[in-house]
Amino acid sequence: MANLNQKKYPAKDDFPNFEGHKSLLSKYLTADMYAKLRDVATPSGYTLDRAIQNGVDNPDFHLGLLAGDEETYTVFADLFDPVIEEYHNGFKKTDNHKTDLDASKILDDVLDPAYVISSRVRTGRNIRGMALSPHVCRSERRAIEKMVSEALNSLAADLKGKYYSLMKMDEKTQQQLIDDHFLFDRPVSRHFTSGGMARDFPDGRGIWHNDKKNFLVWINEEDHTRIISMQMGGNMKEVFERFTRGLTEVEKHIKDKTGKEFMKNDHLGFVLTCPSNLGTGVRCSVHAKLPHMAKDKRFEEICTKMRLQKRGTSGEFTESVGGVYDISNLDRLGSSEVEQVNCVIKGVKVLIEMEKKLEKGESIDDLVPK
């Protein structure tokens, strides 16, 4: 809840100190804009100060903004719009997003299993009418858990599985699931603590997975749901087919049982807590062995030119182990799910081709995108 004493002071005395900050928040939030929006709140009571706290606390963060509900993006559009435009490659406030979940349009190419260890597609979805994780109250969070877990328990055939509440899970089991990359980590990072997303942990949180452990749903991590399809090897089409089928089933069961739908609009696509995930929310990734590419100074630049993102073996801010990298789509907003997945397939094929050439001591100059 906002401090009611705040209104006794002029907005200029409340403006954050952005000295040494690198975020898009610090670039676009002016004193005049802050004065205009400081005392405004969304219908559920989320304020500008809550939306920017994540960035105020962390000078090194790239964005520095989090939504507390679906309306955050319209009520505070003066700030969010320019941040979204710069982060999402020029996506303007007049642009519309496009959605395409047709698995038949995914390229048939199976990525070379000698280089690709595993493939994964994930997205986030939030339930309309409920606050997002920086602003959600305990009763809402528990209602989301009940709603989603009951919908998931309706899945059948190869998607049939079980829900595991973190409240009922012992520490050893929880850590094993984290180590196996099935479960999200405990919310101890600055992103979660500053953003108010670690509150009440592990209350209302859990993981659901099918019997084969290749279709998973995280409940109440950063978003209400994180829906994940994954498997060993490089058959991304198979991964995406299961992903879309499971996603469609979950949405249908939630709507049939509760009348609720996912947050979505024509402009931003699927509405998620962090502006970086707006649009498809899709992160299509592979773990690929690229030890020779890692020694090439152009590696990151090559990935960026192909609209790919390179991370360490265990994700963002981690190092590569044994030359294994996490390679994923860079874009989320303005292009469809099918386009983003196909971008990864095509790009990783090129990276593997480069790796093979480097193994033989050959030049990759002819393969480097201009």
Curated annotation (Swiss-Prot):
PTM info: The N-terminus is blocked.
Keyword set includes Kinase: yes
UniProt subunit comment: Homodimer.
Identification of the protein by name: Arginine kinase
A molecular-function term among this protein's GO annotations: arginine kinase activity
A GO CC annotation given for this chain: extracellular space
Key words of the record: ATP-binding, Kinase, Nucleotide-binding, Transferase
Domain Phosphagen kinase C-terminal: 115-358
